[in-house]
């Protein structure tokens, strides 16, 4: 693993996608400048043949992470050693931090992604740029005091939904998948670490926009077992069908395969209601609005079943364009 340069930069919560796209475009421009400089060096007489070969190899493999790491280790010492007598080498040396292909991730919460910043997120996905987005889905505006967002499920209490939310959660992942060229995944690390890592690897390798939505238990959920059991809570959420694991990879459709993979096992629906009762955001409805709690909790379970059945249908359906006879 090669870790270099800034590990983190951030702007306002709601414009995290636009900010991240700007950072990505900035790196892209710097690397384009490197290509121009190396082409000038290749065409000129100031560099020896061996250096020109390295420059040509980097131009060909600059988007291959492993190759760019190896080539950077060879190119950087050469251009730095010749910086005083070669202007092109001096400029390349000043941009050497961009020789290695960077892994860039845009990270935000559900409030910004599903709700107040959704327009920005949609714009970034629609750009077609090779960006990676990770949404930490706490199902509530965690940073601003626990207000309900479009990620908040039916029956959960939050600010602006004091009697329990009455409409179902937005399916951000499926909305993004309708573009057809966006890699999408829904994960829960505590439920399946292998599936989470696989989704991250696939998103990083995919040449285009990607979005991963990760279930993230939050202090606003009021876990009765305590936040120290957040990973176990994720496992329970998937086991009972509250949260589902899946991946949508457009590259598979190009190969004539089904791009949608449902990674969740058949839920144990009999555990669903107990899962809700294990979190204060749901249990509070039973105390404050007992006459409505059963109806809301049943609606929450029905919504989860509806969503799971939809995913199961997508995992079985025929994809692609049907050819006429």
Kindly label every feature range from the protein language model.
Residues 1-3:
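Short, small-residue-biased leader/transition segments that mark boundaries at the very start
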Residues 9-84, 88-91:
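N-terminal leader/propeptide and maturation segments of large enzyme subunits in energy/redox metabolism
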Residues 20-28, 114, 162-166, 186-190, ...:
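Hydrophobic alpha-helical scaffolding
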Residues 26, 30-37, 51, 67, ...:
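General structural feature for long, well-ordered alpha-helical segments within catalytic domains
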Residues 31-45, 59, 79, 125-129, ...:
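Structural signal for hydrophobic packing residues in well-ordered secondary-structure cores
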Residues 84-86, 92-93, 98-106, 113-132, ...:
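Glycine-rich ThDP/TPP pyrophosphate-binding loop and its adjacent helix/strand module
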Residues 221, 235-280, 286-322:
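Long, compositionally biased charged/polar accessory segments in the mid-to-C-terminal portions
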